[in-house]
Amino acid sequence: MIYSHLSSTSCTITTGCKVNLNLYITGILPNGWHKIDSIFLPLSEPHDELHIEITNHNQGLHLSCNILDIELENNILTKTYTLFTKATHFTPSISIYLKKGIPYGAGLGGGSSDAAALLTWLQKNSPLPLSPSKLLKLAAEIGADVPFFLKNKPCRATGIGEKLEEISLSNLNISGNTLFIICPNLKISTPYAYKMWDDYNKKQIATSSRYNNNLTKKYSWDRSSPSTHLSDYLWMKNDFEPVIFSEYTELSVFKEQLLQFGARAAVLSGSGSSIYGLFKEYNQTSIMTEFYKKKNILTFSQLLQ
């Protein structure tokens, strides 16, 4: 997250997003939450902006947004403010204007990223900040991906996503590649996606005899073969794809298109709806940008360094 327009009473925070380089669903907890094993990769684009201003209206939190159909009463920012003030008794009167640039319902973690930004701001401004361990615990209570955005570094996430192990980008063997993200005009609710997965698997946990905890040994592919797709390899998979693609067939078409354009891998991010491709050369993405622009489909690209 990046701070700008910083003053004693206001600031603007730019928040990035994430993609899942893989996503395995490894169990279901008694409370219905799902255990995962996933690689989270933070990205600077697309991004949101939070303009936070301290007011004198004794109103608690006032939230507004440039997207009209985003729910404000039940928003994750409201939840963040409520839980932090309850834990610390720090109740600043603030107004937040949220400028959405990250498509929501796209599996990019925009809401969790915004929550982490607000949580960081509250922590920095609180006269009685939480200890690091309590802050992480509160972040996980807000949302499973929020602890990751507090770190904002490549991580292997386990548990419900709150147990994080930092990973060097160089160890993933993807430095120098370009990530190209397609964000179709389609919103997929994460709870609905998990329900579809549960129904598809008849409450049985998906397992693979090829999958084990030594995942870090498998962050590579045969660079000598130009036709090799990363998606042929164990680690770049997403357990949501069979169920999501059966319901939203257009997403499987996007994946196939990315592979036809020369992607070394094409994978659904999170529970969707965004699909990304990994390309060896940055200039490969310019043709795709124009191709999808003509179809009024949002795309983003980022060189991984």
Swiss-Prot record:
Pathway: Isoprenoid biosynthesis; isopentenyl diphosphate biosynthesis via DXP pathway; isopentenyl diphosphate from 1-deoxy-D-xylulose 5-phosphate: step 3/6. It comes from Lawsonia intracellularis (strain PHE/MN1-00). The lineage of its organism: Bacteria, Pseudomonadati, Thermodesulfobacteriota, Desulfovibrionia, Desulfovibrionales. GO terms for biological process: isopentenyl diphosphate biosynthetic process, methylerythritol 4-phosphate pathway; terpenoid biosynthetic process. GO terms for molecular function: 4-(cytidine 5'-diphospho)-2-C-methyl-D-erythritol kinase activity; ATP binding. The gene is ispE. Catalyzes the phosphorylation of the position 2 hydroxy group of 4-diphosphocytidyl-2C-methyl-D-erythritol. Keywords: ATP-binding, Isoprene biosynthesis, Kinase, Nucleotide-binding, Transferase. This is 4-diphosphocytidyl-2-C-methyl-D-erythritol kinase. It catalyses: 4-CDP-2-C-methyl-D-erythritol + ATP = 4-CDP-2-C-methyl-D-erythritol 2-phosphate + ADP + H(+). The active site is at residues 18, 145. Belongs to the GHMP kinase family. IspE subfamily. Its EC number is 2.7.1.148. It comes from the Bacteria. ATP binds at residues 103-113.
